[in-house]
Amino acid sequence: MANDQKNSESFPAKEDHKKDDAAAPAEVDHKDEFSASQPHPVENIVLVGRTGNGKSATGNSIVRSKVFKSKTKSSGVTMECHAVKAVTPEGPILNVIDTPGLFDLSVSAEFIGKEIVKCLTLADGGLHAVLLVLSVRTRISQEEEMVLSTLQVLFGSKIVDYLIVVFTGGDVLEDDGMTLEDYLGDNMPDFLKRVLILCGQRMILFDNKTKDDEKKTKQVHELLKLIDLVRKQNNNIPYTDEMYHMIKEENERHKKEQEELESKGHSEEQLAALMKELQIMNERNLKAMAEMMEKNMKIAMEAQEKLFEQREKAQEMSYQQKMEMQEKLKQMEGRMRAEMEAQMLSRQQCSIL
């Protein structure tokens, strides 16, 4: 603990993707280039969850700098994937990826498809941990269930092996004299029970409003221990899927062709025209991948809506009927997921070009 307190200073952070320079505070260190010569590896951490649950605030707490836009509004703030790198004391470099309200019921499948492709592009090397952000301030909603189901459908069922549940609102529980265990209690929603079982009970409570430096350091330190546990349990292998490899291959092809053009001695005018053609081709190929993800997302949404309809009907049944319906729902959910994964695998095996 003494060592944790000693290293309580802010982590130097660097934005990987930003369009609004005003979002970067003065304390962000832009001199650190995070080159391949860094002594510690880069670990990609992606934040997912319903809009308003505190994803951006959690990202700011992790990197110890206000680089992610964060407001306590139900409409949310972040509208595109955004990555920030931060050096942790005597630990890995974290590449923290904040996401828009992916899987929010109000967001289009087209937007989600594009943002997932962008997210996977930012996660060079694969995903080392997925943080599912929930809030103790709000009840578990259908959108939370949509997040988990869609994650499994789009990325495969193994994504839960990299899942950590982050509960925000630690200040609320502290004011009420409650621990996270007290909050979860005996009346835990079935969805939450299922999530915690799937992720091996990996969970943590975050207070994103605290001014206590020691507390800030401690909660990040505890999160790093969970991330390290995920890494060890997955044999140091980050999560990748077919879509990730397709994006990686496309970007590597684009980079290689750029280098070949630059080495052929074209005039500046010729080079600019050829580079523009290459860029158009790259954008077209990435757009095709985004459209594939959009189709997958629509499949997931339709299946989830059917599942919600069945659950609503189950609310009006007797206890025995509910038990029978729950068993049928589990079987139905399993079949839907298997069918969707089979359809997506079939699509992904088709040539995009």
Swiss-Prot record:
Residue span of region G4: 168-171
Span of domain AIG1-type G: 40-248
Region span, G3: 98-101
Stored CDD domains: AIG1
Regulation: induction: Up-regulated early after infection with P.syringae carrying avrRpt2. Up-regulated by brassinolide, cold treatment, syringolin, P.infestans infection and, at a lower level, by salicylic acid. Down-regulated by 2-aminoethoxyvinylglycine (AVG), high CO(2), isoxaben, and propiconazole treatments.
This protein's record includes keyword Nucleotide-binding: yes
The keyword Nucleotide-binding is annotated on this UniProt entry: yes
Reported tissue expression: Mainly expressed in leaves.
Polar residues: bias regions: 1-10
Coiled coil regions in record: 244-291
Residues the entry annotates as binding GTP: G49, R50, T51, G52, N53, G54, K55, S56, A57, S70, N208
Record region (G1): 49-56
UniProt region (G2), positions on chain: 76-80
Pfam families registered for this protein in UniProt: AIG1
InterPro entries listed in its UniProt record: G_AIG1, GIMA/IAN/Toc, P-loop_NTPase
Gene Ontology molecular function terms on file: GTP binding
Family: Belongs to the TRAFAC class TrmE-Era-EngA-EngB-Septin-like GTPase superfamily. AIG1/Toc34/Toc159-like paraseptin GTPase family. IAN subfamily.
Stated name of the protein: Immune-associated nucleotide-binding protein 8
Species the sequence originates in: Arabidopsis thaliana
